[in-house]
Amino acid sequence: MKGYRSRYTLEAADRIRKLHPQVKQEIRQAIKELLVSPLNGHSLQFELAGLRSYRIRTYRIIYRINDDESCLDIVFVGPRRNVYEELRTLLLAQREDS
């Protein structure tokens, strides 16, 4: 499998920036691993179909594989307990703005 590059949404970049330095380092390391093996994350279903989730400690990295551009789109990062609800809310707000 070819190597991928990462691309971050503004929301994901902002959330990573606000994390504790140790957690931020672990998230960045996990993303580097995903660039080599992007299928390591779990496929999401229903309204989140097309996205994948990767667990690192108590956090989730939500991303999309873009094979055409050899890119991983990092969509969202957050604590496991509410990451999917927050992501659904964000996606719904984006659809309403369109």
Q: Predicted regions: what is each one?
A:
Residues M1-Q25:
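Arg/Lys-rich, positively charged N-terminal/basic patches that mediate binding to nucleic acids
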Residues K2-R5, R64-S98:
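Enriched for short, Lys/Arg-rich terminal
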Residues T9-E11, Q29-I31, R52-I56:
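Short, functional N-terminal and low-complexity linear motifs
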Residues Q22-K24, I31, Y59-I62, L87-R88:
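Enrichment for repetitive, rod-forming helical segments
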Residues E33-S37:
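Short proline/glycine- and basic residue-enriched helix-capping loop/turn segments at helix->loop/beta transitions
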Residues L39-N82:
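Basic/aromatic recognition patch in beta-strand/loop cores that engages polyanionic ligands
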